[in-house]
């Protein structure tokens, strides 16, 4: 907890992920005194734990790489997949102002971004979709440049073997290490990068941490303090205007006397969703649900949403999340990406039947796990838990839950029952609680599809997105491979998430709204504390961070404009 001599700023930003840091950076560069308060002992939030991708069509990074796109195509695509659940003005504000935001950030921080070639939009065949992708990611960053603030950077979610630093575009190639020369070449490149960094005394970080680190340096240069272990407890209202926040030391009891920090111009909530609030998840989201399956930052307990709701803020899309099929490993759930796309695997429900294209975008995959429209409906989810079924050949060829190809499944995973292993499909079915006859029939039917290269039931491998994490050396379909080389494995799959989606309704400037559409003066929101501009869908890699940064930017600009700071 900090005890400041100055208890008043122009702008108070709650949360230190991408949304909060960009908002603070803009406010400071517009001449507004700004502070960031962060509940956790580290800064960066869920952004730092993520892949760090940013989905903003027609930005300067893409243009420099010669990526052929148009604003019209992006508009057609995003409006088409989001539908009418989100105000079209908000979608347009994101598309129109996102590139401007990114240029500002690149100018005022040491952040370096690059295109992720081939990382397809999640619905590339939709009108305006791009099979070649619109996602960019941060280049590896030397965290030593942070100085004393290096220690405060949020740790990475998962440890990479041998402590190598990887980018998103590395991961897809490393998964092909045993299957394609490109995998070998990429592993050599990653190894050389790591050795060079060690030889030159650098502490390279990648993915989300390589996004947050440069943003923190931008705040250092702008003189913006980031106060850690400072828990937001409530909003301060004066004369009908949100004019500050109450905070306490995160180490103190919740009953401790809070400290008031006044905000002369506005408060920007950027403190994440409610993925770690069990009561809120049970209240708003379909069963089964738990805080144990999320990979979001542990400090995200809905504090901002609850405080805004007390002031009459409207909430929207609270039933949804940035879902993804997840292996609920004890203590650290594994958000499954390539595991579902690699050939030689299927996902079945407790009836032993397939129920979706296993390789589809992860939010939609979990909607299918729950069943109904966008995962909503009466009663508990229809296909939870599910089981990812694969064989030894799959295990020998591909990365699985952070294990290298051929690496043995840890005994603690098997002992927990999250992973089961057997010499026959019938035995595997018994261990997983599945009907043996149905599982055997499902695998036999799927194997016929694998031989023909056509998934007649769910069209797996037909989309460019499916194929991105597939195996190009596997013919005739990079996503379909027979399951028939014992021993067999089953991995329990549950609807995990990167964070919750729902939150405070906002306008094009990030201002918090009431149910009647009126504005809560002085209060702004960006990131997962706010209802998403993406609605129930997910357009492509970085479709969470891109809007978080953009609406943090727009919120700070609006405050500055209202204050006459240009």
Swiss-Prot record:
Catalytic activity line of the entry: a 3-oxosteroid + A = a 3-oxo-Delta(1)-steroid + AH2; a 3-oxo-Delta(4)-steroid + A = a 3-oxo-Delta(1,4)-steroid + AH2
GO biological process: lipid catabolic process; steroid biosynthetic process
Signal peptide range in chain numbering: none
Pfam families the record matches: FAD_binding_2
Keyword entries, A-Z: FAD, Flavoprotein, Lipid degradation, Lipid metabolism, Oxidoreductase, Steroid metabolism
Keyword Flavoprotein attached: yes
Cofactor(s) of this protein: FAD
Domain of life according to the entry: Bacteria
Residues involved in FAD binding: 10-39
Function: Involved in the degradation of cholesterol. Is also involved in the formation of 3-keto-1,4-diene-steroid from 3-keto-4-ene-steroid.
Similarity remark: Belongs to the FAD-dependent oxidoreductase 2 family. 3-oxosteroid dehydrogenase subfamily.
Protein name, entry field: 3-oxosteroid 1-dehydrogenase
């Amino acid at each position: 907890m900090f005890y400041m001599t100055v208890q008043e700023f122009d702008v108070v930003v709650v949360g230190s992920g991408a949304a909060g840091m960009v908002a603070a950076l803009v406010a400071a560069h517009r001449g507004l005194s700004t502070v960031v308060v962060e509940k956790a002992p580290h800064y960066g939030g869920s952004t730092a734990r993520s892949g760090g991708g940013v989905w903003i069509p027609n930005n300067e990074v893409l243009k420099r790489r010669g990526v052929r796109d148009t604003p019209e195509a992006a508009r057609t695509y995003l409006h088409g997949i989001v539908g009418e659940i989100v105000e079209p003005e908000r979608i347009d504000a994101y598309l129109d102002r996102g590139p401007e935001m990114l240029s500002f950030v690149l100018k005022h921080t040491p952040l370096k971004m690059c295109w992720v070639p081939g990382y397809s939009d999640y619905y590339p065949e939709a009108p305006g979709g791009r099979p070649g992708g619109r996602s960019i990611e941060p280049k590896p960053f030397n965290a030593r440049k942070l100085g004393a603030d290096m220690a405060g950077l949020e740790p990475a979610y998962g440890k990479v073997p041998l402590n190598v630093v990887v980018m998103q575009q590395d991961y897809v190639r490393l998964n092909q290490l045993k299957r394609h020369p490109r995998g070998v070449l990429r592993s050599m490149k990653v190894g050389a990068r790591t050795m060079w960094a060690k030889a030159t005394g650098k502490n390279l970080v990648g993915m989300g941490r390589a996004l947050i680190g440069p943003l923190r340096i931008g705040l250092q240069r702008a003189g913006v303090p980031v106060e850690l272990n400072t828990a937001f407890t409530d909003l301060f209202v004066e004369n009908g205007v949100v004019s500050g926040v109450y905070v306490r030391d995160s180490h103190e009891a919740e009953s401790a006397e809070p400290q008031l920090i006044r905000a002369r111009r506005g408060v920007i909530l950027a403190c994440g969703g409610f993925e770690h609030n069990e009561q809120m998840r049970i209240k708003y989201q379909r069963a089964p649900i738990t805080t144990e399956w999320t990979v979001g930052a542990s400090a995200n307990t809905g504090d901002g949403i609850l405080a805004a709701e007390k002031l009459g803020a409207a909430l929207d899309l609270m039933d949804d999340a940035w879902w993804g099929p997840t292996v609920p490993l004890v203590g650290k759930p594994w958000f499954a990406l390539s595991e579902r796309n690699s050939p030689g695997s299927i996902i079945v429900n407790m009836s032993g039947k397939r129920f979706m294209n296993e390789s589809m975008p992860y939010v939609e995959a979990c909607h299918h796990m729950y069943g109904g429209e966008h995962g909503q409906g009466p009663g508990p989810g229809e296909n939870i838990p599910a089981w990812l079924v694969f064989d030894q050949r799959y295990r020998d060829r591909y990365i699985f839950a952070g294990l290298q190809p051929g690496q043995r499944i840890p005994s603690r995973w098997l002992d927990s029952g999250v992973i089961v292993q057997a010499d026959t499909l019938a035995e595997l079915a018994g261990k997983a609680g599945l009907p043996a006859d149905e599982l055997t029939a499902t695998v036999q039917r799927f194997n016929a599809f694998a031989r023909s290269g056509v998934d007649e039931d769910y069209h797996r491998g037909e989309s460019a997105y499916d194929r991105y994490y597939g195996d190009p050396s596997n013919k005739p379909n990079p996503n379909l491979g027979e399951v028939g080389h014992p021993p067999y494995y089953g991995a329990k799959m549950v609807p995990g998430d990167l964070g919750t989606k729902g939150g405070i309704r906002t306008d094009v400037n990030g201002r918090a709204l009431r149910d009647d559409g009126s504005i809560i003066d002085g209060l702004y929101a960006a990131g997962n504390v706010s209802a998403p501009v993406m609605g129930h869908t997910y357009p492509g890699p970085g479709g969470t961070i891109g809007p978080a940064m953009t609406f943090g930017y727009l919120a700070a600009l609006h405050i500055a404009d209202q204050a006459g700071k240009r």
